[in-house]
Amino acid sequence: MAVTLVTSFASSSSRFHFRSFSSSPSSLSSCFVRFQFPSRLRLAFAVTPLYSSSRAMAHTISHATLGLTQANSVDHPKISFSGKEIDVTEWKGDILAVGVTEKDMAKDVNSKFENPILKKLDAHLGGLLADVSSEEDFSGKPGQSTVLRLPGLGSKRVGLIGLGKSASTPSAFQSLGEAVAAAAKASQASSVAVVLASSESVSNESKLCSASAIASGTVLGLFEDSRYKSESKKPSLKSVDIIGFGSGPELEKKLKYAEHVSYGVIFGKELVNSPANVLTPAVLAEEALNLASMYSDVMTANILNEEQCKELKMGSYLAVAAASANPPHFIHLIYKPSSGPVKTKLALVGKGLTFDSGGYNIKTGPGCLIELMKFDMGGSAAVLGAAKAIGQIKPPGVEVHFIVAACENMISGTGMRPGDVLTASNGKTIEVNNTDAEGRLTLADALVYACNQGVDKVVDLATLTGACIIALGTSMAGIYTPSDKLAKEVIAASERSGEKLWRMPMEESYWEMMKSGVADMVNTGGRAGGSITAALFLKQFVSEDVEWMHIDMAGPVWNEKKKAATGFGVATLVEWVQNHSSS
């Protein structure tokens, strides 16, 4: 008896037909599936994106996932930031948060503060601030904070937040913002003011960046990803006044910039936090399409399906995707300013493995972290998070291509095997000696594609090697580039954003380890210098006339203490793009 099943999935832009045939119930082994796709794949499933165009921060995924899991809808509160120049004793609100160094906490022989700001506050509080800070053993060390309910000021509470020896870097001011957010959450405060006890330590030139870092830290500190929990708390903080850092349109613009970047970071965090049974390659592609829809005045999207990737001869990328029941989706977002000339074309390429089992070289044993391999798309999350922020900021004079070869690395009879030889889209051949070194195989074709867009510079980001974690730990990413100029640009951007990068060598002699007897190269070169040989591999797929950098972010993509994604890379990428704009 013949069996025929026809199922259709429709979207606003296309219709998909999945037709299965079997000659009889007893010959299911001969069953095959025919896929009929339109020329451009727009939707693979019925999906409600993480971000709805009607609400800037709406997070719902409605999808028949394994486990029937759906993300709860979460609306993140909007915080109003403003710069003010007022007497701290006159500010009215819930918490007056004072950032203090260890030096600021010094007291005279009468146990009174020597710092002018603390002395003024203590005078209005009848000496209680000095007394209580001593009782609390608060000394201004980093990580220390205390919130006191003391009568005598316009604010309901006074918070002291330790800055350590000094506060002069963006990361220090971001930490101050995070501490402010923690205090606000604990007290359910709706209004907070932030002031430094010693603002003279901040130069006039750096006040804008410092205020921006405080704002960013506050937004990120308030964020909790509760989409997959049965209960969640909604932060009550509505407004933050930053005192002593200036005021006016220039500061307001910088604070708004920080807000846009922060929500891009949050988007990146949520993508990485999403489990692999929810965030498939199709859903990741839909998130990219939704960004293009949200910022349609400056952004367009092109999602390539498997057949289109075959036409482009992406044999390396498609080999990785071959074992998965979830088809690959090649994502290409393009940002173009709505007006004015384009002076620079950039490409941001992110590794997009929504799950990595390791393939036939399956991840086994302690430390393999297979349960965390949802974060193997951290590079793509950084790229799409940057796209979200750039869509909001709209920098003039620069065109940006956001590229992700999204897929899963699974195990099946159709999957790539150790020993297989793959042909990338630039014609180079690769002998697979480890199926768990798959990220570089997807990036190979993505880099070729990026260079073919006529860009001047390419930066790729990937959770690529454990070797980089061994070398640098989990607090910083390694950068690899032949270009000293590009290295300086990206490092400068990271310093302003507060993210840590360290330049690693591109030791060309190590390429000997990557040679194959049957192909142009192998995909791994052994344990020694593993992150360097990975970068040398990627270099083979970059045009000589394009400046290129690889960022290995395997370490800082995940915060094990918080058991959550960090959103690493977004802020640096946005800052780097902004530095190329004509604004």
Curated annotation (Swiss-Prot):
Amino-acid positions noted as binding Mn(2+) 1 in the UniProt annotation, renumbered to this chain: 351, 356, 376, 438
PROSITE patterns reported in the protein's UniProt record: CYTOSOL_AP
The entry's keywords: Aminopeptidase, Chaperone, Chloroplast, Hydrolase, Manganese, Metal-binding, Plastid, Protease, Stress response, Transit peptide
Entry GO terms, CC: chloroplast; chloroplast stroma; plasma membrane; vacuole
EC number of the protein: 3.4.11.1, 3.4.11.5
Binding site for Mn(2+) 2: 356, 436, 438
Catalytic residues identified in the record: 363, 440
Gene3D superfamilies with a match to the protein in the record: Leucine Aminopeptidase, subunit E, domain 1, Zn peptidases
Pfam family for this entry, one: Peptidase_M17_N
Transmembrane helix listed as a keyword: no
Compartment(s) where it occurs, according to its Swiss-Prot or TrEMBL record: Plastid, Chloroplast
GO biological process: cellular response to heat; leaf senescence; proteolysis
Subunit note: Homohexamer (dimer of homotrimers).
Its biological purpose: Presumably involved in the processing and regular turnover of intracellular proteins. Catalyzes the removal of unsubstituted N-terminal amino acids from various peptides. Possesses leucine aminopeptidase activity against the model substrate leucine-amido methyl coumarin. Does not seem to possess Cys-Gly dipeptidase activity. Functions as a molecular chaperone to protect proteins from heat-induced damage.
Protein name per its UniProtKB record: Leucine aminopeptidase 2, chloroplastic
